């Protein structure tokens, strides 16, 4: 990604949210439909076995009374440090930065989703070239759930992901 290859600083990026729909991985009628999201590359992923691949960050799953994001690290064979932070008291639009406290991120269990809820996802670590050195760092994305359809087993959310290495800001450098 260009933001990680520029030794002079972060690249401008578009902070316009994209809308994403995912279906629960737990329902057989959804086989072949995207149930996971790759925040790093900002794309949906069809995952038939959550232990089979690591090219995604969260998967949608059924939990008692609703749907949830499950971070990749909650599955024993994947072992990533993807984390989900539940944000309270701040709207999606007003959330300007991801939490710094590592303890704010849930890495090992499902995070129930609510319509209007705001979340931050810390992606899996990936190679990032900065100042001629390669490091493995996450990206950060903010999410707000706009629709949950329990009968269909689907969730719709808006997401903004900062493409720059380990940058917690949700404000593009152009807007600073």
Please place each PLM-identified region on the residue numbering:
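Surface-exposed, beta-sheet-biased, low-hydrophobicity segments with strongly acidic/polar composition
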Residues: 4-176
């Amino acid at each position: 990604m260009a933001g990680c290859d520029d030794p002079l600083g972060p690249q401008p990026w578009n902070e316009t949210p994209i809308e994403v729909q995912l279906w629960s991985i737990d329902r057989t009628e959804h086989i072949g439909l995207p149930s996971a999201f790759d925040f790093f590359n900002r794309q949906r992923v069809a995952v038939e076995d959550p232990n089979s691949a690591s090219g995604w960050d969260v998967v949608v799953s059924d939990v008692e009374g609703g749907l949830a994001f499950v971070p990749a690290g909650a599955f024993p064979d994947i072992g990533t440090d993807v984390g989900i932070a539940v944000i309270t008291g701040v709207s999606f639009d007003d959330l300007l930065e991801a939490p710094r406290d590592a303890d704010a991120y849930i890495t090992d269990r499902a995070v129930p989703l609510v319509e209007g809820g705001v979340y931050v996802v810390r992606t899996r670590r990936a190679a990032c070239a900065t100042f001629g050195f390669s490091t493995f760092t996450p990206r950060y994305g903010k999410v707000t759930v706009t629709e949950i359809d329990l009968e269909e087993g689907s969730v719709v959310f808006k997401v903004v992901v900062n493409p720059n290495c380990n940058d917690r800001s949700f404000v593009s450098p152009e807007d600073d």
